[in-house]
Curated annotation (Swiss-Prot):
Subunit structure, as described in the record: One of 3 components (of 35, 45 and 105 kDa) of the enterotoxin.
Keyword Ribonucleoprotein: no
Keywords assigned by UniProt, alphabetized: Enterotoxin, Toxin, Virulence
Protein name: Enterotoxin
Entry keyword annotation includes NADP: no
């Protein structure tokens, strides 16, 4: 279960940060 939750958390964090940092959107 943790293996599935980890990537989801990263994706969510990257998307939230992407709103403020356009550079991060490239990674998302």
């Amino acid at each position: 279960a943790q293996n599935v939750i980890a990537p989801n958390t990263l994706s969510n964090s990257i998307r939230m940060l992407g709103s403020q940092s356009p550079l991060i959107q490239a990674y998302g």
